[in-house]
UniProtKB/Swiss-Prot annotation:
Skewed-composition ranges (Low complexity): 162-182
Function of the protein: Packages the positive strand viral genome RNA into a helical ribonucleocapsid (RNP) and plays a fundamental role during virion assembly through its interactions with the viral genome and membrane protein M. Plays an important role in enhancing the efficiency of subgenomic viral RNA transcription as well as viral replication.
Family under the similarity heading: Belongs to the alphacoronavirus nucleocapsid protein family.
PROSITE patterns (alphabetical): COV_N_CTD, COV_N_NTD
Major localization listed first in the record, in broad terms: virion
SUPFAM superfamilies associated with the record: Coronavirus RNA-binding domain, Nucleocapsid protein dimerization domain
Lineage of producing organism: Viruses, Riboviria, Orthornavirae, Pisuviricota, Pisoniviricetes
Region of interest: Dimerization: 231-334
Bias kind Basic and acidic residues: ranges: 201-235
Protein name: Nucleoprotein
Length: 382
């Protein structure tokens, strides 16, 4: 095999399944960690007979590195001194990594099954193995997984950790309650002793408490601080929208002031989505240093114009809310639509009433009809 590696081609591969050699693999306690969760094999099945030859997990490495091997983990449990075998686990490692990092592709090793994607390079990868502090990844494949294979998940470790944390938290809460009850008893006795000492000194604690409550009540009854923006003596471009209608500061919506629907204009910064909309507006420094500015005389004033372009993320929900406010004044509101619909329905009902044939000209037919037969009489006599 060339030192630079060759492309994998399964075209000349025999259809006969790969078997095991008699050489022994390394013991489990020496095995580096795989990037992926293991495959558990049903008892009685043989992994090397069932494993597709391109059974390489997705998501790691480039197309040249989709090559490696599945390494067997033999498992058992001791029950009353007797060994009870458990289903085998198989872990995937990339070529040049793991317990058989020095092995060549297709080298016969006990408990090893080689796999590769068509066109992968038969030279060692540099992908390494998983660190001890990292979680293993879920297995995903672009080929059919044999029904005898069970792709394991990390539930057992998470559940074990959760149960351990729950037990620890329960013990902590119980200890905390015990300490708190003990501390409360001590605090009560200390408080009583202090009150008795103050009373002997002539200090009336009840009157002091009443005065404190009275001051607190006075503060609560005092007027709340007015947070309404002071806009009277400010230029239009320095005014701040408060709660309520903003047209008195910025005028009605038009082609030159085209932002805001009826709710936003009527309620100002108390509108439902105002905080989200404000997050989509550039900062002062962004406008100052990231805009194109022009100025010209306009009578006794200077007219200043700036153009600012920026981008909002398309998949952000706030962006959708922001875009709905642009030119909203030119679109009919939902309230106006509903009013027009009600008005149209009312007019339609009036027309129907006007078109009803007078009772004197209709045939008085009182037969009872079933659900499938209806006779309509629409004959008017002169």
């Amino acid at each position: 095999m060339a030192s630079q590696g060759q492309r994998v081609s399964w075209g000349d591969e025999s259809t006969k399944r790969r078997g095991r050699s008699n050489s022994r693999g390394r013991k489990n306690n020496d095995i580096p960690l795989s990037f992926f969760n293991p495959v558990t094999l049903k008892q009685g099945s043989k992994f090397w007979d069932l494993c597709p030859r391109d059974f390489v997990p997705l998501k790691i490495g480039n197309k040249d590195q989709q090559i490696g091997y599945w390494n067997r983990q033999i498992r058992y449990r001791m029950v009353k001194g007797q060994r009870k075998d458990l289903p085998e686990r198989w872990f995937f490692y990339y070529l040049g990594t793991g317990p058989h990092a020095d092995a060549k592709f297709k080298q016969k090793l006990d408990g090893v099954v080689w796999v590769a994607k068509e066109g992968a390079m038969t030279k060692p990868t540099t992908l390494g193995t998983r660190g001890t502090n990292n979680e293993s990844k879920a297995l995903k494949f672009d080929v059919k997984v044999p029904s005898e294979f069970q792709l394991e998940v990390n539930q057992s470790r998470d559940n074990s950790r959760s149960r351990s944390q729950s037990r620890s938290q329960s013990r902590t809460r119980a200890q905390s309650r015990g300490r708190q009850q003990s501390n409360n008893k001590k605090d009560d006795s200390v408080e009583q002793a202090v009150l008795a000492a103050l009373k002997k000194l002539g200090v009336d604690t009840e009157k002091q408490q009443q005065r404190a409550r009275s001051k607190s009540k006075e503060r609560s009854n005092s007027k709340t601080r007015d947070t309404t923006p002071k806009n009277e003596n400010k230029h239009t471009w320095k005014r701040t929208a408060g709660k309520g209608d903003v047209t008195k500061f910025y005028g009605a919506r038009s082609s030159s002031a085209n932002f805001g629907d009826s709710d936003l204009v009527a309620n100002g910064n108390s509108a439902k989505h105002y905080p989200q909309l404000a997050e989509c507006v550039p900062s002062v420094s962004s406008i100052l240093f990231g805009s194109h500015w022009t100025a010209k005389e306009d009578g006794d004033q200077i007219e200043v114009t700036f153009t600012h372009k920026y981008h909002l993320p398309k998949d952000d929900p706030k962006t959708g809310q922001f875009l709905q406010q642009i030119n909203a004044y030119a679109r009919p509101s939902e309230v106006a639509k509903e009013q027009r619909l009600r008005k149209a329905r009312s007019k339609s009902a009036e027309r129907v009433e006007q078109e009803v044939v007078p009772d004197a000209l209709t045939e008085n037919y009182t037969d009872v009809f079933d659900d499938t037969q209806v006779e309509i009489i629409d004959e008017v006599t002169n």
